[in-house]
């Protein structure tokens, strides 16, 4: 028990140092860590979740290890601190695609958006994990993907820990691409008031119709998972219950941005380009698989536009005439979405 307590105290002190936790008279921040906002993040919550460790990567970045009681395992959380952390700042939850940030297909490795966001007064929080899960609560454990209660983790367990550890102002936005382009619409519906803005890049909101269902099944099966363990067989009521298109009323009041390409090759679809996998095979995959996925996303996003218009819910839609399901277009989309996210976060555009 003493060893565990010491580890948590050291980790709390590390966050206190990075987050600029002040001490009276310029005293030792390690000695004061238990009284700091950072240390509070290490207190076990009523649900059993807690921050168990942290690694400071540099003066702006750290990795937290957060125990999820709902899933019974520890999740890595990458954090980029604001340009100015002298006062409480808002938080942008930035989700990965199908790989869950566990592979090389990450915002850090494929884009420069972290550098772009480094100039903003916002905490950027990226969960590492959840590959092929849609960041949702699965109805049962999956033989390949295990126990998944990502909705519970992202909406109930993680935010209060982040708020206490980083001393945020409690204002949140969420953004994601491809697989998580669906999740970032589901999560605000599931947790009203948690987020003020959401941006979905190349997602598919309409998951319970045949096109959307097959889109989800294709992604989940790529990781060896079975969607029957997620929401049940096709037509099960859980599919409709988790469909952002059908439940779009829950998005009212949010600042919304949705974007997609057409599936037709564009400027970032070039041989050995900066956003293309190496070689002819990499480009061919981007043009064929990436083209088909983006065309499906385009279909879903147009339908979502019609749905929001029907409900009188304002949103910004960015339909590009070209573009495949690939990183160059997602980087462009995130930059384009920043004014919308910033408005929700009460930050300058």
Please give the residue ranges for each predicted region:
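Non-catalytic cap/lid and distal C-terminal segments of serine-dependent acyl enzymes
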Residues: 2-13, 19-349
């Amino acid at each position: 028990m003493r060893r565990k307590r010491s580890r948590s105290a050291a980790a709390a002190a590390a966050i206190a140092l990075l987050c600029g936790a002040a001490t009276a008279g310029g005293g030792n921040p390690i000695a004061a860590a238990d009284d700091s906002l950072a240390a509070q993040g290490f207190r076990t919550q009523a649900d059993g979740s807690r921050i168990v460790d942290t690694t400071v990567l540099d003066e702006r970045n750290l990795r937290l290890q957060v125990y999820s009681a709902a899933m019974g395992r520890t999740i890595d959380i990458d954090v980029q601190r604001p340009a100015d952390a002298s006062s409480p700042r808002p938080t942008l939850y930035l989700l990965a695609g199908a790989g869950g940030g566990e592979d090389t297909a990450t915002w850090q490795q494929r884009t420069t958006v972290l550098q772009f966001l480094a100039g903003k007064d916002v905490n950027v929080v990226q969960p590492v994990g959840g590959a092929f899960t849609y960041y949702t609560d699965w109805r049962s454990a999956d033989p390949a993907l295990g126990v998944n209660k990502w909705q519970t983790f992202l909406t109930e367990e993680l935010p209060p820990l982040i708020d206490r550890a980083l001393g945020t102002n409690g204002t949140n936005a969420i953004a994601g691409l491809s697989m998580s382009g669906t999740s970032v619409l589901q999560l605000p519906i599931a947790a009203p008031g948690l987020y003020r803005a959401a941006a979905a890049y190349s997602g598919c909101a309409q998951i319970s119709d045949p096109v959307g269902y097959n889109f989800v099944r294709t992604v989940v099966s790529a990781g060896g998972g079975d969607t029957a363990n997620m929401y049940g067989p096709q037509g099960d009521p859980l599919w409709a219950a988790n469909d952002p298109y059908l439940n779009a009323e829950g998005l009212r009041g949010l600042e919304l941005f949705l974007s997609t390409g057409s599936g037709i090759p564009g400027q970032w679809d070039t041989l050995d380009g900066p956003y293309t996998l190496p070689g002819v095979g990499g480009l061919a995959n981007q043009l064929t698989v990436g083209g088909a996925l983006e065309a499906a996303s385009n279909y879903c996003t147009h339908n979502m536009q019609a749905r929001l218009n029907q409900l009188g819910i304002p949103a910004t839609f960015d339909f590009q005439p070209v573009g495949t399901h690939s990183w160059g277009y997602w980087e462009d989309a995130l930059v384009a979405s920043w004014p919308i996210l910033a408005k929700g976060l009460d930050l300058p555009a």
